[in-house]
């Protein structure tokens, strides 16, 4: 009988591209993740197609452009990672819906921010929608990844996949972990927090750990500071999506400064990084 673990651990890294020059950077990020994990990379591009009913000529012109973009992405990835298996998909549907559908069959979904409305949070409607609905962990690329600083992770004191992800990322980058905990009114989760941190610290003894306990009114400031000073910001999405709102409504791209990537882990994502057996490879992959 085929092992479920052996199947699900081969789920690909999926990256969404929309046809702009900045997409090359996000493809690079996704390729690095896929190569590190030893899994295939799949590049997904949504083109207007039938959604642009007012201009058949424009829709027909977009499809070849989309195919050309995917060909460029494949060549770029294969130059950097010759042995990496790369697949592509040109889909005739909305980008947000397509990416959420693919997230049910991926181990990691990668998108870039796009401040298309000038809102200041640097995400854009597609990334914001996917952040709330992605089935797998979502990595939001927000510019050049800083080469210094720790990995910051929001922790609750529970045994979660986001905390494991933080230690794995820090060990890979050769840096420390800053565990940020929001103090609960009238409660003390210090012992639980210490236990959760100690468990992963035992597995990664070379990763330094700093603990930062803040009040609720300090969340926005802390996220903004972490976005500018850390290599990676990790948070569990939560069942109500409040952490997503906190991340993309805090900070932004003020002054044109680059912000670190954000990794959002959905509720219920297994601590070992494994997904349910029904999450299978997309048709045509």
Question: Where are the language model's segments positioned?
Answer:
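Structural beta-alpha unit
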Residues: 1-8, 22, 57, 78-109, ...
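Small/aliphatic-rich secondary-structure junction motif
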Residues: 2-57, 148-190, 197-212, 232, ...
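Conserved N-terminal glycine/acidic-rich loop preference
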Residues: 35, 41-43, 63-70, 106-114, ...
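Short glycine/serine/threonine/alanine-rich loop segments
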Residues: 37-39, 84, 136, 175, ...
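Short, surface-exposed alpha-helical segments at coil->helix boundaries
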Residues: 60-74, 190-197
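Short beta-strand elements of ligand-binding domains
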Residues: 110-113, 137-143, 262-266
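Glycine-rich, Arg-bearing micro-motifs that act as flexible, cationic patches
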Residues: 110-129, 148, 232-257, 268-273
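Short, structured interface segments
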Residues: 125-144
